[in-house]
Amino acid sequence: MITVALIDDHLIVRSGFAQLLGLEPDLQVVAEFGSGREALAGLPGRGVQVCICDISMPDISGLELLSQLPKGMATIVLSVHDSPALVEQALNAGARGFLSKRCSPDELIAAVHTVATGGCYLTPDIAVKLAAGRQDPLTKRERQVAEKLAQGMAVKEIAAELGLSPKTVHVHRANLLEKLGVSNDVELAHRMFDGW
C-alpha cells in the first residue's frame, strides 16, 4: 500500500484528488492539509511515502516547503503554471514529480506510482517544454526587458529606451514572470543575477 498526503489550500482540489486516488486498490490518502504550516506540523510520524503538494499556497510556497518536508518522502508538485523555469525550480528543490493541475487522472496515478518506486515523473508535454526551455527560454526582447527591470528601471523608462509602448513592456514583463516562475521584479532580479 502506498500512503499519500495531499497539501493544497483548495478543499475541492484535495477532495477530488483524495476520491480519485482512493479508487486505486494500492493507494491510500492518509493525510490532507490546507496549508504548508499544517503539513509541517502534521506530517511527521504519519508514515507518508508520497506527498502531493500545491506550489502556490498563501502561507508557505510549495517550493519553500519542499526543503522542510520529512526526509525520504517523495514529493509531486502541482501547479496551474508549467513553465520550464518553474519545473526546474521544483526539481532542483527536491520534487520527484511535477504535474499541471490540468493533468489527467491517469497521469496523477502514474506519477504517484512512479515516485513511490524511486522514479521521477513529468508528463510528456512538460518534459518537452523543459527540454525546449533549456535552450533559451527568453526571446531577445524579453532578455532586454529583464535586464532593465533587474536594474530597477520603471516600465515607462524601459519603453522609452527600447522604443516600445508601455503596454508592450508590460506584456514582456508578464511573459518573463511566467517563464521564469517568479512573481515580482525583485525575484526576477535575483534570477537574473543567478544566471536564470
From Swiss-Prot:
Limits of the Response regulatory domain: 3-116
Classification via InterPro entries: CheY-like_superfamily, Sig_transdc_resp-reg_C-effctor, Sig_transdc_resp-reg_receiver, Tscrpt_reg_LuxR_C, WalR-like
GO biological process per UniProt: phosphorelay signal transduction system; regulation of DNA-templated transcription
Subcellular location: Cytoplasm
Main location: cytoplasm
DNA-binding span(s): 155-174
Keywords: Activator, Cytoplasm, DNA-binding, Phosphoprotein, Transcription, Transcription regulation, Two-component regulatory system
Top-level taxon in the UniProt lineage: Bacteria
Task performed by this protein: Part of the UhpABC signaling cascade that controls the expression of the hexose phosphate transporter UhpT. Activates the transcription of the uhpT gene. Acts by binding specifically to the uhpT promoter region.
Record-given protein name: Transcriptional regulatory protein UhpA
